[in-house]
Amino acid sequence: MARGKFITFEGIDGAGKTTHLQWFCERLQAKLAAGDRQVVVTREPGGTPLGEALREMLLNQPMDLETEALLMFAARREHLARVIEPALARGDWVVSDRFTDATFAYQGGGRGLPRDKLEALERWVQGGFQPDLTVLFDVAPQVASERRGAARAPDKFESETDAFFTRTRDEYLRRAQEAPHRFTIVDATQTIPEIRGRLERVLAAL
């Protein structure tokens, strides 16, 4: 069986990506069913027992910026080794709620960690491995903030300022501009039916 594909969903907190991820995965599974392939749904940070333990620390405990980035990539290495790479080798498809683009956006753009440090970690942990497709849910930080305000108690990232999320969004868009072959940008201010129509077109092209 041919190697599977790796798809990531990205966007600032409040963009709505997680709302659409399960629906997208159900549609993708239906599309792949005839070929006896499975869709593995996962997330970052997380996806493994170690990754989930690190997620709890990363989202809720204050820490040094470089420590934060190192833990993100430690969780990612475990995720790649235990979940993503084995699934792709089996011919399954993997859909992840966030991946490395989020680290560049949040720790790089948002928190200001120099890009060269993140690029060095990326090379060490991933080599040349990148998603086959990244769906970026783009929304203005002010809109995302209003959405987050109606959600559950915020973690330390969700509690950040609009200025932080503006820098984070800008870095996401920079990443998308540098890799247009990999990114599909979704206008996350649209209605749910409009966004799902856009995702249907993404699915049709896979």
UniProtKB/Swiss-Prot annotation:
Disulfide bonding pattern of the chain: none
The cross-references to InterPro entries, in alphabetical order and at most eight, read: P-loop_NTPase, Thymidylate_kin-like_dom, Thymidylate_kinase
Q: What is the lineage of its organism?
A: Bacteria, Pseudomonadati, Pseudomonadota, Betaproteobacteria, Burkholderiales
Q: Which SUPFAM superfamilies match?
A: P-loop containing nucleoside triphosphate hydrolases
Gene3D superfamilies named among the record's database cross-references: P-loop containing nucleotide triphosphate hydrolases
- Indicate whether rRNA-binding appears among the record's keywords: no
Reactions catalysed, semicolon-separated, are: dTMP + ATP = dTDP + ADP
Q: Name one Pfam family in it.
A: Thymidylate_kin
The entry sums up its family as follows: Belongs to the thymidylate kinase family.
Official protein name in the record: Thymidylate kinase
Per its UniProt entry, what is the enzyme's top EC class, as one word?
A: transferase
Q: Which residues bind ATP?
A: G11, I12, D13, G14, A15, G16, K17, T18
The EC number on file is 2.7.4.9
Instruction: Please tell me whether the keyword Transmembrane is annotated for this protein.
Output: no
Q: What does this protein do?
A: Phosphorylation of dTMP to form dTDP in both de novo and salvage pathways of dTTP synthesis.
- What does the entry list under GO cellular component? cytosol
Organism of provenance: Burkholderia vietnamiensis (strain G4 / LMG 22486)
